[in-house]
Each structure stands twice: as structure tokens, then as C-alpha cells.
Amino acid sequence: MSGHSKWATTKHKKAVIDARRGKLFAKLIKNIEVAARTGGGDPAGNPTLYDAIQKAKKTSVPNDNIDRAVKRGAGLEAGGADYQTIMYEGYAPGGVAVLVECLTDNRNRAASDVRVAFTRNGGSLADPGSVSYLFSRRGVVVVPKTDGLDEDDVLGAVLDAGAEEVNDLGEAFEVLSEATDLVAVRTALQDAGLDYDSAEAQFVPATQIEVDVDGARKVLRLIDALEDSDDVQNVFANFDATDEVLAQLDED
């Protein structure tokens, strides 16, 4: 894993903007439903469901929507769909590697949406395995900055729980661990009285390609097109950009 990724900062800000638009609500609800179906409807005994609910609450998803998603997933309420996880791999303009994580009840629709997004935005789909080796599944916890909280405070709280790295994202800290240590790291933060925005397993790139303003715009255009699909849950890409490039993107 390379050091601090400025793209992570942009991604964090983008998530906040998307949430304000309500774009994330359906995806967060789907996460809850699938977590409840996989591990049961009790958050106390299902850490994945607990974290999915916490993220939805942080994003202001109404409690009623959350409760109904849990019930659908647990089979207590009708209307739940049979979602499958499907991964697609491809390249954005400039050779940036892209992993697309879909959660869908219609494989053909998902495949079509992903293919169209790549072809219309200068990218290309790749064979399975040609991109995924560049990423590893990691535990990622985002901790908002509060007055007086610094990197050492966060690291001190999570080091014994298996955390490997703490990155400063500007408005928040990002704690990285093995995916299997995610719950332990999140619990350690809670025990230390530290709030967190999200705790989830993500695909983190081992190396990153630095892009200029034009390159960043092209990659982000592709990511936006992919995320517009209801079937796409997450998009991961191995690109980074300097502060100057990010500042220009903010002006767009």
C-alpha cells in the first residue's frame, strides 16, 4: 500500500456530496438488506449489518427505511430481492485500473450498464484477473477530525487492534487494516470514545498512477457514469492527483 492518497480525500468529499443528493440512499439500503440476509437481522450478532446501519445513519437515511431493509433481508417482510455480488474489471483513460463491485438481481442488466459506461467514457472492460491483482481487500475506517484529535491519538487507539496505517485525508483520518481486523479496529475506536463515519472492507490499490487535471476529469467522468447505475455499489481506481490538480477539480 502506498502512502497517503489525495484521491481518498476527493472520494471522501464526493461521498458527502453524493449523500446530499440522495444518490447513495438506495445503495446503502441494499447493503443493509444483503447484510441482514447473509448474517441475520440482529446487528449485535452481525458486525457487517451493524456497520451498514451505522453508515446509513451517518448519511441521514431515515430510520424507517433502515428498519424495513433489515426486515426484508431477514425475511420478516416481503419484497426482498435476491442480490448477487459481481465484480467487473477494466481500464479508465490513461491506463488507470478500475474495479467495479455490483450488487444486482439482474446480471444481464448490470453487465450492460457497466459495458456502456466504459465504452462511452473512453475506457475498456478487461478479462477477469487482469486488474484485480493490483488491489487487495482491506479494512477501511474513516474517522472525522474533531478539535484536538491528531493522527497519533487515532493510531494509539487502534494499533493493538490490528491497524496498519493511519492516513490524514484533510477533513478525516483513514485507518487501514487487514479486512479480517476491521471489526476489532472499529471496536477499539468506539472503546476509546472516538466517532467514525464508516467502517467497511474496500479494495485498496497497491500502487497508484498520478494523473493531471485532464486525466483526472476523464477518470472521474467514467466513475460517475458507473455509479449512476443502480446495480453498481462501489468503484475502486488506482489513480492519485496532486493538491494542485485537486484544487482545479474543485473549481469545475
Curated annotation (Swiss-Prot):
MF (Gene Ontology): DNA binding
InterPro entries on file: Integrase-like_N, TACO1_YebC-like_2nd/3rd_dom, TACO1_YebC_N, Transcrip_reg_TACO1-like, Transcrip_reg_TACO1-like_dom3, YebC-like
Nucleotide-binding among keywords: no
GO terms for cellular component: cytosol
Compartments (UniProt record): Cytoplasm
Keyword flag Iron: no
Keywords, comma-separated and alphabetical: Cytoplasm, DNA-binding, Transcription, Transcription regulation
Any GO BP: regulation of DNA-templated transcription
Primary site of residence: cytoplasm
Family per similarity comment: Belongs to the TACO1 family.
Protein name: Probable transcriptional regulatory protein Bcav_1989
